C-alpha cells in the first residue's frame, strides 16, 4: 500500500472514531456544557464542537486575545431561527449527515451563513450548484450575492451566461437591480451571437422602471460592446432611441463610439502606465467578442474514437468529444434544435447471453464534451436511417441484426418522454436508404430490398396523419448514397445499384415534385456523407473500388473532402485525406470553437 494511502486511511479512521465518540457523548448527555435556546426548543451541545466549527460561537466563548470567557452563559439564545433547521445543523456537526432538499436548502443556507458555519455553508453551495436549472438560476444568482458567496454567484452567473438567449425572455430578468443586471450583461462568457440582443435587453430593463433606471444608463453603457454592433444598427436603433437622445452624457459617448467606427480612438491620457491593456479604453469601446460569438457551422465527424469538428473556412479541426463508446456503422442526426443523436452500430454484448446484439442510443451533451446514454433501440438493426419531426426522432426501416432481413418498421423516439414507440410502417421492406426531414415531413429515399433489388422510390411520412405517401421517384435507383437538403432541394450523391458504384447525382424540387440531374461527382462512390454547412455543399469520405497490390479490384475507403462550386456547377477537391473521417458519420452542427481543444 502506498504511504499516502496509508495516511489517508489513518486520517479517515481517526475522524470516524472521533465523530462517533462525540455523537455518543451528546446522546448520553455527557460533558454537555452548552444549551442552544431556539424558540421553544433547547438543543444540548458542547462548546468545544460549536467553537471549533463556527467563528460566531468562538467569539461567544473567547476574548479577542484568545482567553476563555469564564462568565460565558451556558444557555445561548438564538433569535429568529427555525428550531428544526438549527437542530439539523447541530446534528450535522456531530454526524456529518444532513438531509438537504429543495424545500429547506435556502433556510439551512441562511442559518449557516448567519452563524458562520462553513461546513454546512459549503454543503448548501454544492447542492445548489448541482441543482442549477433554467427555473432557479436567477434566484440562486441573487442568493449568492445576498449571502456574499462568490462561488455560488459565479456558478449561477456562468449558467445564466450559457443560457442567456433563453433566460433573457424571462420577466424575472427585468427584476434585477442595476449591479445584478450589469454583472450579467458585462460578462465575457455570454452565449450570445449578436450584441444587439444584449443592447435590446438593456433598454427593455430600463423601460421596466424608466423613472429610476434611465439614470443608470451611463453606467450601463460600460457593459455594452457597441463596436460589435453593425454600424447601421447603431445609427437606426441606438442613436434614435428616445431615452438615449434625451441624455447629453450618452450623446457624448455615442460620438466617441462613432469616431471609433471611423478608426479614431480616444488618446490615452499622459501619465498612464504602459501595459494596462483593457483599462486604457472605456468599457463602451470594448470590442472583445462574447463567448457565443465563437459559434460556427462545422462539419462534425463521429467515429468510434472521437467526434471531431472541422471548420472548412479556416481549415481547422477541433475535438468535440471522445467517443470510445460509440460503435462503428452507427447513424447520426442533428436535430433542428442543434442536438446530436447517435443510434445503432455494430455492437455485441458478450455478457448478455439473452440479447447479445444491442442498438445503443446516445446524445452528445450540449454543455460538455460527454455523451448521455439514452434508452437503447428496442429492436437491434443496421443500415437504417433517421429523421425528425418536432420532438420526435424516427429510425426508419433497415436490416434486423438477428434475422438479417430487411425491415419496414419505423421506431419513434419521444425526446421529452425519453421513450421508444413504433409508428406507421413503411410501405415496403428496405435497407441502405436515406432519410431527409423537411417541411414537417420525413422523406425516405431509395434503398435495397431483400431480393437485392435497388429502388428509386421516395415516400413522405406525415406524422400528424400517420401516413406514408409515394412521391416522384429518382431517375436512377440507388442505395448506400449520400443525401441532404441544400438551398431548398434534396441533393443525392453517388451510391450503388445493380450496375455497380455510381457517380451520378440528382436534386429534388419540393415545389414541383420533380427530380433533375445534378452535377456529377468526380468519382464513383458509395456511403458518401453529403451535408450542407452554412450554405455550402460538401461530400465527405465514402467507399470506391481500387486495385490492390494483387491487382484485384476491392472496396477501399476514401477519407477526402469535396466542395460543390455553385458558380461552376462542379465538385472540387478540398482535402485529399482527412484522417478523422475514417469510419465516421458526418453531420452539420453549430458548435463553439472557443470551448473545444484545437487539434
Curated annotation (Swiss-Prot):
Residues 137-239 form the BACK domain. Keywords: Cytoplasm, Cytoskeleton, Endoplasmic reticulum, Kelch repeat, Membrane, Repeat, Sarcoplasmic reticulum. The keyword Heme does not apply. It comes from the Eukaryota. InterPro entries: BACK (IPR011705), BTB-kelch_protein (IPR017096), BTB/POZ_dom (IPR000210), Kelch-typ_b-propeller (IPR015915), Kelch_1 (IPR006652), SKP1/BTB/POZ_sf (IPR011333). PROSITE patterns: BTB. GO terms for cellular component: Cul3-RING ubiquitin ligase complex; cytoplasm; cytoskeleton; M band; sarcoplasmic reticulum membrane. Disruption phenotype: Morphants exhibit leaner bodies, smaller eyes, and pericardial edema. At 3 dpf morphants show reduced birefringence in axial skeletal muscles suggesting disorganized skeletal muscle structure. GO terms for biological process: proteasome-mediated ubiquitin-dependent protein catabolic process; regulation of sarcomere organization; sarcomere organization; skeletal muscle fiber development; swimming behavior. CDD domains: BACK_KLHL40_like (cd18477). Kelch repeats lie at residues 339-391, 393-440, 441-488, 489-535, 537-591. One of its GO terms (molecular function) is ubiquitin-like ligase-substrate adaptor activity. Signal peptide: none annotated. It is found in: Cytoplasm; Cytoplasm, Cytoskeleton; Sarcoplasmic reticulum membrane; Endoplasmic reticulum membrane. Residues 32-102 form the BTB domain. Involved in skeletal muscle development and differentiation. This is Kelch-like protein 41a.
Amino acid at each position: 500500500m502506498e504511504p499516502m494511502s496509508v495516511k489517508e486511511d489513518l486520517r479517515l479512521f481517526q475522524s470516524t472514531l472521533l465523530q462517533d465518540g462525540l455523537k455518543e457523548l451528546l446522546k448520553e448527555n455527557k460533558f454537555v456544557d452548552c444549551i442552544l435556546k431556539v424558540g421553544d426548543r433547547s438543543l444540548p451541545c458542547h462548546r468545544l464542537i460549536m467553537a471549533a466549527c463556527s467563528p460566531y460561537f468562538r467569539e461567544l466563548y473567547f476574548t479577542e486575545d484568545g482567553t476563555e470567557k469564564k462568565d460565558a452563559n451556558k444557555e445561548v439564545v438564538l433569535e429568529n431561527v427555525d428550531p428544526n433547521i438549527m437542530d439539523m445543523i447541530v446534528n450535522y456537526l456531530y454526524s456529518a449527515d444532513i438531509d438537504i432538499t429543495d424545500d429547506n436548502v435556502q433556510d439551512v443556507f441562511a442559518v449557516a451563513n448567519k452563524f458562520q458555519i462553513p461546513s454546512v455553508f459549503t454543503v448548501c453551495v454544492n447542492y445548489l450548484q448541482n441543482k442549477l436549472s433554467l427555473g432557479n438560476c436567477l434566484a440562486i444568482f441573487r442568493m449568492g450575492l445576498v449571502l456574499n458567496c462568490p462561488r455560488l454567484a459565479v456558478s449561477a452567473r456562468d449558467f445564466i451566461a450559457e443560457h442567456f438567449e433563453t433566460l433573457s425572455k424571462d420577466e424575472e430578468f427585468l427584476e434585477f437591480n442595476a449591479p445584478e443586471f450589469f454583472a450579467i450583461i458585462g460578462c465575457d462568457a455570454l452565449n450570445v451571437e449578436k450584441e444587439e440582443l444584449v443592447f435590446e435587453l438593456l433598454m427593455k430593463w430600463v423601460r421596466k422602471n424608466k423613472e429610476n433606471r434611465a439614470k443608470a444608463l451611463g453606467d450601463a453603457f460600460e457593459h455594452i460592446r457597441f463596436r460589435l454592433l453593425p454600424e447601421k444598427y447603431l445609427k437606426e436603433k441606438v442613436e434614435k432611441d428616445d431615452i438615449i437622445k434625451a441624455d447629453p452624457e450618452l450623446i457624448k459617448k455615442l460620438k466617441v463610439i462613432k469616431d471609433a467606427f471611423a478608426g479614431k480612438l480616444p488618446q490615452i491620457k499622459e501619465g498612464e502606465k504602459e501595459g494596462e491593456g483593457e483599462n486604457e479604453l472605456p468599457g463602451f469601446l470594448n470590442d472583445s467578442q462574447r463567448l457565443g460569438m465563437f459559434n460556427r457551422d462545422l462539419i462534425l465527424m463521429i467515429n468510434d474514437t472521437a467526434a471531431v469538428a472541422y471548420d472548412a473556412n479556416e481549415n481547422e479541426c477541433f475535438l468535440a468529444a471522445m467517443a470510445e463508446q460509440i460503435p462503428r456503422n452507427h447513424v447520426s442526426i442533428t436535430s433542428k434544435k442543434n442536438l446530436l443523436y447517435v443510434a445503432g452500430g455494430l455492437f455485441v454484448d458478450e455478457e448478455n447471453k439473452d440479447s447479445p446484439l444491442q442498438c445503443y442510443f446516445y446524445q452528445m451533451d450540449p454543455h460538455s464534451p460527454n455523451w448521455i446514454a439514452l434508452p437503447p433501440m428496442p429492436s437491434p438493426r443496421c443500415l437504417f436511417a433517421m429523421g425528425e419531426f418536432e420532438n420526435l426522432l424516427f429510425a426508419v426501416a433497415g436490416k434486423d441484426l438477428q434475422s438479417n432481413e430487411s425491415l419496414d418498421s419505423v421506431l419513434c423516439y419521444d425526446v421529452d418522454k425519453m421513450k421508444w414507440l413504433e409508428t406507421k410502417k413503411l410501405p415496403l421492406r428496405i435497407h441502405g436508404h436515406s432519410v431527409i426531414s423537411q417541411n414537417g415531413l420525413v422523406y425516405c429515399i431509395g434503398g435495397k430490398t431483400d431480393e437485392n433489388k435497388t429502388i428509386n422510390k421516395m415516400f413522405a411520412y406525415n406524422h400528424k396523419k400517420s401516413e406514408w405517401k409515394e412521391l416522384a421517384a429518382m431517375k436512377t435507383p440507388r442505395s448506400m448514397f449520400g443525401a441532404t437538403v441544400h438551398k431548398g432541394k434534396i441533393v443525392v450523391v453517388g451510391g450503388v445499384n445493380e450496375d455497380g458504384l455510381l457517380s451520378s447525382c440528382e436534386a429534388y424540387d419540393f415545389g414541383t415534385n420533380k427530380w433533375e440531374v445534378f452535377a456529377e461527382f468526380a468519382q464513383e462512390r458509395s456511403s458518401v456523407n453529403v451535408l450542407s454547412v452554412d450554405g455550402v455543399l460538401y461530400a465527405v469520405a465514402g467507399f470506391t473500388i481500387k486495385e490492390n497490390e494483387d491487382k484485384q479490384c476491392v472496396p477501399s475507403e476514401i477519407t477526402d473532402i469535396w466542395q460543390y462550386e455553385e458558380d461552376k456547377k462542379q465538385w472540387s477537391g478540398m482535402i485529399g485525406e482527412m484522417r478523422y473521417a475514417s469510419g465516421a458519420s458526418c453531420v452539420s452542427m453549430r458548435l463553439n470553437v472557443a470551448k473545444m481543444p484545437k487539434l
